[in-house]
Amino acid sequence: MHYFVLASDYDGTLATDGQVHDETIAALERLKDSGRKLILVTGRELEDLLRVFPKVDLFDCIVAENGALLYWPSSREEKLLGERPPEEFVKILRDRNVNPLSVGRVIVATWHPNETTVIQAIQELGLELQVIFNKGAVMVLPSGVNKAAGLKAALDELKISPHNVVGVGDAENDHAFLNLCECSVAVANALPVVKERADFVTNNRRGAGVVELIDRLIASDLEELATQIKRHDILLGSQEDGSEVNIKPFGTSILLAGTSGGGKSTLAT
């Protein structure tokens, strides 16, 4: 088994209108029974997720608030990966009638067209904050906090390499964590730019697309995709005709032969 972690977005990927269908839950259970791990990577605040999705115990870890919070369902432990923006920032948004406005443990979120007011407040206060878009959602987070950073923190605690992870998502805020994963998958309803960058696009939409992916993952470990996933290949050099020679970063054995001092150690490192 090469891929033993599935990292999935929630809204628009696992869930339709905030709800996960029974068929999708059954597929997640099959994946767990295969010996693999599940990580949920979502922009939702944890309390909101727990309210709409009672099956969080299926997941080994939840990356919430777009990468700002780790939650371990088995122990109910939480770990913050950033600091909430100052209260003065939140006060300005409220004084300027930004609505809706949600303030999580770290994330501050609203919706289009409030991004102009949000950016103006950041500039006025001289804050080092970033604005991340998720379709109509506008999320404010500390610099460097995103779904990729959150997923990497979860994988580090699990002692698992991103090379062993399949990621699936649908929206622009999924780009970072999908790029981290060895294999990136877009569900059929994903934004065109997400599909363009994905290694594989499912035939089905939302939860049905995740079911499709899980069935393929269990059946073949996605071996049929190995030759088309080249994003993480390592360049060794070029042949006489100028064509590149690349190898996979895993599962490849190479014999280095030559005289002492010929550069074998340099090439290997």
Question: What is the role of each PLM region?
Answer:
Residues 55-58, 65-66, 125, 180-181, ...:
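Short, structured coil segments at secondary-structure junctions
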Residues 231-269:
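Glycine-rich phosphate-binding loop of nucleotide-binding enzymes
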Residues 1-2, 34-35, 249-251:
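Short loop/turn elements that form and flank the Walker-type P-loop nucleotide-binding site
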Residues 86-181, 189:
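Conserved acidic, metal-coordinating active-site core of Asp-based
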Residues 1-3, 21, 148-230:
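Mg2+-dependent phosphoryl-transfer enzymes with acidic/Ser/Thr/Gly-rich catalytic loops
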Residues 17, 22-103:
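Active-site phosphate-binding/coordination module
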Residues 7-8:
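Active-site T/S-Asp motif of two-component receiver
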